[in-house]
Regions:
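Extended recognition/assembly regions associated with phosphoester-bond processing machinery
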Residues: 1-77, 81-211
Length: 211
């Protein structure tokens, strides 16, 4: 196992990172999906105990990846938010992150939890719900009609691995689609219904494992 795994997608060298992100070196761009900022706050508000983590931990992971890869942009493939923006505790952490990384471009595709972003004032590049970026079609959900190789999220693919209890987030590589694992730790997941030729790459204990 290693911290990252290089794969060629649509003729481009792409790095699958153990932090559940995809790095495009030629564009210095990180892709993540299903960040769900604010979800941990909602759980705690309703008295649901959670392990350590949440917004601060997720933003720290992004900052670490930016420093390690030299990325100049981070694009979120939908579900940047989870819940309302007003008075959200996570917003303080987000504003501190943007202050420390003011030169970093943060782009967001619209996901099913992102309706409030238009008026949010979060220093984001709002990309709409579909972007053609070089050979890639960026979407929140898989789209078999897209003209390019699809990069997306929404599915939250997970796998079981013998010898490692629990379920682990995974990249799901198909012939013309790469589904990213959910970046947030506070999401459910499911085992993909794979077809012949599909590949899964699991993220576990800071390493990636091709299955």
């Amino acid at each position: 196992m290693a911290e990252s795994l290089e794969r060629t997608l649509a003729g481009e060298s792409m790095h699958l990172l153990a932090e559940r992100a995809l790095f495009w070196p030629s564009r210095k761009r990180l892709f993540i999906a299903d960040l769900h900022l604010g979800k941990a706050d909602i759980f705690r508000r309703f008295g649901i105990a959670l392990p350590s983590g949440g917004t601060r931990h997720d933003l720290s992971r992004i900052a670490s990846m930016v420093e390690r890869t030299g990325a100049t942009s981070v694009w979120v493939l939908g579900d940047f938010l989870h819940g309302a923006i007003d008075s959200a505790q996570w917003r303080v952490g987000w504003e501190a992150f943007r202050g420390a990384h003011s030169a970093l471009e943060v782009g967001v595709l619209a996901g099913n939890h992102d309706r409030a972003l238009v008026r949010a004032g979060l220093d984001l590049l709002l990309l709409g719900d579909a972007v053609e970026d070089g050979p890639f079609s960026l979407r929140h959900m898989p789209d078999p009609r897209a003209p390019g190789h699809v990069l997306c999220g929404h599915v939250h693919p997970t796998v079981k691995i013998e010898g490692f209890p629990g379920r682990w987030p995974a990249f799901w590589l198909q012939a013309s689609t790469c589904v990213l694992p959910a970046f947030s730790a506070f999401t459910g997941g499911r085992t993909p219904e794979t077809m012949q030729g599909d590949r899964l790459v699991a993220c576990l204990h800071g390493q990636v494992l091709a299955l």
